[in-house]
Amino acid sequence: MKAIVFDLGITMKDVVERPINKDYVMVSPSLVLLTGIENAIYTGFLWVEPKRILGSTGIVKVRNAGIEVDKNIEGKKAIVLPYSKKYGGIGTEIDGILAENAVVPSDSLVILPNDYDVKYILYPFVSIGLQLRKIVRGFNVLIIGGGLVSYISALTLVGYANRIYLYNDDGYKVRLYGVEEVKDGGNWDIVFAGSMRSWIRILLQLGSKEGDILALPRFLNSWPSIIPTRLNVKFIEPIKMDGVFDYIEDEISDKLFNELVVSSDSLEASIPTPKPGVILNAEKIFMS
């Protein structure tokens, strides 16, 4: 079968179809969301094993379920979260969804309603932001990074955090109401590091106090390899939870969605991503 793999670069290759383990499902990808994870692999910042099938998150159709998985989900559309609590990072530590017939852990699936909107592809990042609300309520928070998890988390915290600061040293920027851009020091109680590339450097540059809360999105078990011991670290996983679909419907406008992501039919034009996210039409990629 055809798959997009890491092999001294990101390329399409013919690979052997993977077996369906007892708690896995076989899926066919419809739309794959390329993000900072794939950018980090492309630039060499994030190492993955050679021949690893990429694709951390997106919309898929469930084809077959393993023997320990409910058969009723077969034939349904689902979101694949970029992290499995049992097996680790999808498309990084285990094979991802950029294959004609991909296999992923069943605990990474969120079944979609029949009338789903393409904006639901942002589900993993919204789930992280909604969980962050419990940590930052009433506090000042600094968000580091210019990717989807940073911008969407900032958006979800408006009205919950006291003040929201965003440090983004990437070229592409999106303005959000209630979010202040910073380039130097400030007064915050909590740091959310949404950048895989430079968050430690920025923490040192902007300053952080012993005991400050450092919140990190959990996309891999093996990242980060270094954590400042003087900080109170909290990991936040993308999870299935109530309220995510409603939040996307009510708060993420078409205008904002189109500022954050762009659609593409070409792998070559999609990595590195020109916006925080690229929605790759996997059906067209594998048909060509």
Label the model's feature ranges.
Residues 84-85, 169-172, 217-221, 239-241:
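Short, acidic/turn-prone active-site loops that include or flank metal/cofactor-
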Residues 173-235:
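Glycine-rich cofactor phosphate-binding loops and adjacent beta1-alpha1 units
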Residues 9-10, 84, 147-148, 195-198, ...:
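Short beta->alpha connector loops
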Residues 142, 242-288:
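C-terminal hydrophobic helical "lid"/dimerization subdomain
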Residues 118-185:
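Mid-domain Rossmann-like dinucleotide-binding core that forms the NAD(H)/NADP(H) cofactor-binding site
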Residues 80-139:
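NAD(P)H dinucleotide-binding glycine-rich loop of Rossmann-like/cofactor-binding domains
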Residues 3-5, 141-143, 161-171, 190-194, ...:
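Short, hydrophobic beta-strand segments that form beta-sheet elements in well-ordered domains
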Residues 18-33, 43-84:
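Glycine-rich beta-strand-centered segment in the early N-terminal region that forms part
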